[in-house]
Swiss-Prot record:
This is Oxidoreductase ptaF. GO terms for molecular function: monooxygenase activity. It comes from Pestalotiopsis fici (strain W106-1 / CGMCC3.15140). Keywords: Monooxygenase, Oxidoreductase. The lineage of its organism: Eukaryota, Fungi, Dikarya, Ascomycota, Pezizomycotina. InterPro entries: NAD(P)-bd_dom, NAD(P)-bd_dom_sf.
Length: 261
């Protein structure tokens, strides 16, 4: 039986991953989060489903993280933020924590290593974003500049470990809290907006590809049965993000949690 570790299991992507796994397979889920009550409120079925084991802690809690990753075939790195936080290190700290734990496992002889799946963004990829109007992409890059810089550094960090650790870099476009319509993976294109449920299904498909076609690749997600609804929180998120970019000293006074709805 397969086992997945989902880091950031209370976020939109994390909950969508749990829902997809529990709906479609007998795979076990190791859900890593800081607030178990929140997870149980968002995905009530985790309370009674024997396939789910919850690990409560922060990414710096090495022992809890090690227990969460133990025996897993795949690790989904979904700890992220929609707030353009100056000096953001969420993705880097997550990746560093995972690498540290897996290095110890490797030294102790626990092989093979799980495959990592990093949630990133098409906006920072020149190929996947080639059809995005220049003005729009420029606005998007600035509205999440601190988050995107964190993701760029995280990708460099993980690619530096590719001789022993495989990562898939999932880079969707705009995301929406919406129903699942159907998806396809692409190495050349993205489609916006995509629902979190379709994104999650795409991440699972990529990690399970028997030929490893997506290993160490930048992977886009396209819709196959129509786009998701426009995420209503996006305009405010962009506006607040731009303020954080041009006047980072204002960030503590700006609204938070303004991401997709």
């Amino acid at each position: 039986m397969s086992r997945y570790a989902i880091l950031g299991s209370t976020g939109n992507c994390g909950t969508a991953l749990i829902e997809n796994v529990l709906d479609s397979s007998m795979t076990e889920v190791h859900a890593f989060c800081r607030n178990q009550e929140k997870l149980e409120r968002l995905v009530p079925r985790v309370i009674s489903d024997a396939r789910v084991k919850v690990f409560v802690g922060g990414i710096g809690d090495t022992e809890t993280l090690a227990a969460c990753l133990h025996g897993c075939n795949a690790v989904f790195l979904c700890i992220t933020t929609n707030d353009n936080v100056p000096g953001c290190r969420v993705a880097q700290d997550t990746a560093l924590g995972v690498v540290k734990v897996l290095e110890r496992s490797r030294a102790d002889g626990f092989l093979p290593m799980p495959k990592l799946v990093l949630l990133s963004s098409a906006t920072i990829d020149d190929v996947l974003s080639r059809n995005t109007p220049w003005v729009l992409r420029s606005i998007l890059l600035k509205s999440a500049s601190h988050v995107y810089e964190d993701l760029r550094k995280t990708e460099i960090l993980l690619r530096a470990e590719q001789d022993w650790l495989t990562t898939i870099f999932i880079k969707p476009g705009a995301l929406s809290v919406d129903i699942q319509r159907g998806h396809a993976l692409s190495l050349t294109d993205e489609d916006s907006p995509v629902s979190y449920l379709d994104l999650a299904a795409a991440m699972i498909e990529a990690v399970n590809d028997p030929q490893g076609r997506y290993d160490m690749r930048n992977v886009g997600v396209v819709n196959t049965h129509g786009r998701a609804n426009f995420p209503s929180g996006t305009p405010l998120c962009i506006a607040v993000g731009l303020l954080s970019h041009f006047a980072p000293f204002l960030h503590p006074y700006l609204p938070s949690g303004t991401g997709p709805r």
